[in-house]
Regions:
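Glycine/proline-rich, positively charged
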Residues: 24-30, 41, 85-202, 209-216, ...
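Structured C-terminal cap/extension of enzyme domains
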Residues: 41-48, 64-65, 184-371
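Short beta->alpha linker loops
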Residues: 51, 55, 149-150, 249, ...
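Short, well-ordered alpha-helical microsegments
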Residues: 56-60, 151-156, 254
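Short hydrophobic/aromatic-enriched beta-strand-loop microsegments
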Residues: 71-74, 164-171, 265-271
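A short, structured active-site edge motif that brings together acidic residues
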Residues: 71-84, 110-113
């Protein structure tokens, strides 16, 4: 069994380890407790939460904080700028609520959450990094960083302006890195010698559920490996990556990730070629790049289940068996008031989408497909 009790997540030369992302926890808290026990019992200890992850902080209080010694785990939490109306008052109020929700006296890692160009002026005018540094001086934060979803130029400005940031959390996966902008983010982090915590290594599950032709490529090569393990392995081996977060929602996913890290080996040239073949198949699939983070849900005045609508659209488009009518039936089981058809295109959901999706426009595609 591996033991990461003394793992230095701030040392970019260290081999990456597995982190427990809590965005998609099961509703059953007893199941979460079993997952936490298994995670810690296998020597892993980095657990990531956020104020906006539904009941995640409270669940960790029950499943982790009340049941395990404080020196057996690290917790990362986040400051969401878009939920603040004034600083420092709202920062203090939200931070104290996070401590109360988690039952912790301090956070091991704390991030300014989901930064992009739209938050730049707020971050600088309110000196959110400076406020976090003050909490660090008080011992309430041990290590400070930020998570990022913007363009390359702003990422470099952040890295230059804020040397007080000790690490960066980036979306990294073989789809976004090999065919998207994520390689540029990765190169910048390496340039500034920043340790990288990886989020969305499986891109919200979309790299665990590939189109049949793409899945066939990987299964013929390695029939006993899960599809998701390819995505996890790719990100874990990237330079400067010290932790790969996986938003696990059941014990099967937990055990699969543990197996992947236990058997971690560099990808061969043939395996790299296979991933490029998979990407060629994915290029034929015009899906919606939603990762089901649900950051948009709190902004919708009609409580439309945006993530579920996009997931069903992608499932139907991905299905080459001719059974997409099954997905359509499931979609129509959603109450009409929560379906894509109810969207009034107000755009309130758009600003907080980390993937920068034009949600109202994409909802139109959902309506058209399932009408």
């Amino acid at each position: 069994m591996k033991n990461y009790s003394s793992h230095d997540y701030l040392n970019p030369a260290k081999q990456a380890t597995l982190g427990f992302g809590t965005m998609r926890l099961p509703k059953d808290r007893a199941e979460t407790a079993r997952m936490v026990d298994t995670f810690l019992g296998n020597g892993y200890n980095y657990i990531d939460t956020a104020y906006i992850y539904t009941n995640s902080e409270e669940t960790l209080k029950e499943a982790l904080v009340k049941r395990h010694p404080r020196d057996s785990y690290f917790v990362a939490d986040k400051l969401p700028p878009w939920m603040l109306k004034k600083c420092p008052e709202d920062c203090v109020k939200l931070f104290e609520e996070q401590l109360r929700r988690t039952g912790l006296e301090y956070f091991d890692y704390y991030l300014v959450h989901s930064l992009d160009e739209g938050k730049e002026q707020q971050v600088e005018d309110w000196d959110l990094f400076g406020w976090c540094v003050e909490q660090k001086k008080k011992g309430l934060i041990k290590h400070l960083g930020f998570s990022y979803h913007g363009g390359t130029a702003y990422l470099e400005r952040l890295l230059k302006r804020h040397p007080e940031s000790e690490f960066v959390q980036l979306q990294q996966n073989y789809l976004d890195n090999l065919r998207g902008p994520a390689t540029e983010w990765h190169e910048l982090a390496v340039k500034y010698n920043q340790p990288i915590i990886v989020m969305e290594p499986v891109k919200g599950g979309s790299l665990a559920k590939l189109p049949p032709a793409a899945e066939k490529l990987l299964k013929e090569y390695a029939p006993n490996r899960s599809i998701a393990s390819w995505a996890i392995q790719y990100t874990a081996l990237l330079q400067n990556v010290t932790c790969v977060l996986s938003g696990m929602s059941n014990m099967e996913q937990m055990n699969d990730n543990l197996k992947t890290f236990e058997d971690m080996k560099p990808l061969t040239a043939q395996e790299h070629d296979l991933l490029n073949q998979v990407l060629n198949e994915l290029a034929k699939f015009a899906g919606i790049p939603c990762t089901a983070c649900k950051y948009c849900h709190g902004d919708c005045p009609l409580n439309i289940d945006i993530a579920a609508s996009f997931a069903m659209y992608n499932d139907a488009k991905r299905d080459e068996s001719g059974n997409s009518w099954n997905t359509a039936m499931v979609y129509k089981s959603i109450p009409e008031s929560n379906r894509a058809e109810a969207c009034i295109k107000c755009g309130a959901c758009v600003a907080n989408c980390p993937q920068h999706i034009d949600i109202p426009a994409e909802m139109g595609k959902v309506v058209e497909l399932f009408k």
